[in-house]
A protein has these predicted regions:
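Cap/insert and terminal regions of metallo-dependent hydrolase folds
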Residues: 2-7, 11, 38-41, 54, ...
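Divalent metal-coordination and catalytic microenvironments
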Residues: 122, 132, 163, 221, ...
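Active-site metal-binding loops of divalent metal-dependent hydrolases
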Residues: 133-135, 164, 226-227, 258-260, ...
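Short gly/ser/thr-rich secondary-structure transition/capping motifs
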Residues: 111-113, 137-146, 168, 205, ...
Length: 360
């Protein structure tokens, strides 16, 4: 009964339930007079009047000053309750189809390629970008899909890191990537962590609503908010920021939502970017709701956020690759496809298979 629950905790950096005893109720909110603000003063801030990322007692918080996550009482309830979908989940053999990627370096067109979970390859103007590099089976997680290409064949120019949970930032992946001339674009205070995994990677840090300083590149990349949290070991909770990314290239926008709950930050992003061509949105790891709602979006919430962002094409992610929650592996995509069939999704929906090339 507890397998996926232990795996979820391991994926966020908790080796056992007992570690959670050290946490306060992580939903608690600070007061405005206890908040300090920080940002990378060397970067341009794209939101007028934005003071920087809020922090309370040296730890990052969300826009509403919450620390996100679920309190210990709810985690305990989850661990001691039966999963009502236990048998359905046990019998779910869903596996995302995989297309082999051979001759990746011969690709010339601009495109998006899904590698599973939150890892995407973006080929823009001859440069390769990789989001949230987790291409192995980290932190005792079993990966249910194979890779379409060996890690050693991924010649990446830029890594885009949304946050540091183990199912998004994998030490093995970072250490095995060919790192010559590779740059990591990361949240505030993540640089030291990345370089401890691979000292050859150049690191640039940004706060929310800040544009990375990229010389002679055909694209702009802006770091934006997400409603989430950070933890890899019990004592570093929220010491490193989390977020999402906007990529602007040749008149198109690609939004990578990272890991996030549904919150007001989507409207803030929409106010800066009138339309978004491609929205890469998380749809899985949402049950039970009383634990996951403060961390992740379910398919319906992801579509609501997509509408608020005025997105044109919805590309789902964060499902079917790892077992992180109580829902069956096939459920997130089934719910999303039902919304598409019902005409609920305003815009197009493209559920990529792993290794499938989407020209843009």
């Amino acid at each position: 009964m507890f397998t996926s629950r232990r795996k979820f905790l391991q994926s966020i950096g908790l080796g056992s339930l007992s570690v959670l005893m050290f946490k306060k109720d992580v939903q608690e909110t600070g007061t405005s007079d206890s908040v300090e603000f920080t940002r990378n003063e060397s970067l341009r801030t794209v939101l007028d009047g934005y003071q920087g990322n809020p922090m309370i007692d040296g730890r990052f918080v969300n826009s509403n000053l919450s620390t996100s996550g679920a309190p210990f009482s709810r985690i305990l309830k989850w661990f001691t309750s039966a999963n009502p979908q236990k048998e359905e989940k046990k019998n779910d053999r869903y596996s995302i189809p995989v297309h082999n990627l051979s001759g990746l370096n011969a690709i010339r067109e601009d495109c998006i390629i899904w590698l599973g979970h939150a890892s995407f390859l973006l080929h823009l103007g001859g440069k390769w970008l990789l989001t949230d590099p987790c291409l192995t089976s980290p932190a005792f997680q079993k990966r249910f899909t194979r890779l379409p290409i060996p890690i050693s064949e991924l010649n990446i120019d830029y890594i885009l890191m949304s946050h540091g949970h183990y199912d998004h930032l994998d030490t093995t992946t970072i250490s095995e990537l060919p790192s010559e001339n590779m740059t990591a674009l990361v949240p505030l205070r993540m640089g030291e962590l990345i370089q401890s995994m691979n000292k050859n990677i150049s690191v640039h840090e940004a706060g929310w609503f800040q544009e990375f300083s990229l010389t002679d590149e055909p694209f702009r990349i802006i770091f934006l908010p997400a409603q989430h949290w950070y933890l890899r070991v019990p004592w570093d909770r929220n010491k490193i920021l989390w977020g999402s990314f906007m990529i602007e290239y040749k008149g198109k926008r690609i939004y990578f939502a990272g890991d996030t709950a549904y919150a007001e930050h989507f409207l803030s992003i929409a106010s800066l970017f009138p339309t978004i061509d491609y929205c890469l949105m998380p749809i899985g790891a949402y049950k039970p709701e009383y634990v996951m709602k403060s961390n992740h979006t379910n398919p319906e919430e992801a579509v609501q956020a997509f509408h608020e962002l005025r997105g044109q094409t919805f590309i789902p992610m964060h499902y079917g690759t790892f077992d992180l929650a109580d829902e069956p592996r096939s459920e997130p995509l089934r719910r999303l496809k039902q919304m598409e069939s019902d005409g609920t999704i305003k815009g197009s929906m493209k559920a990529l298979e792993i290794g499938e090339i989407l020209s843009i």
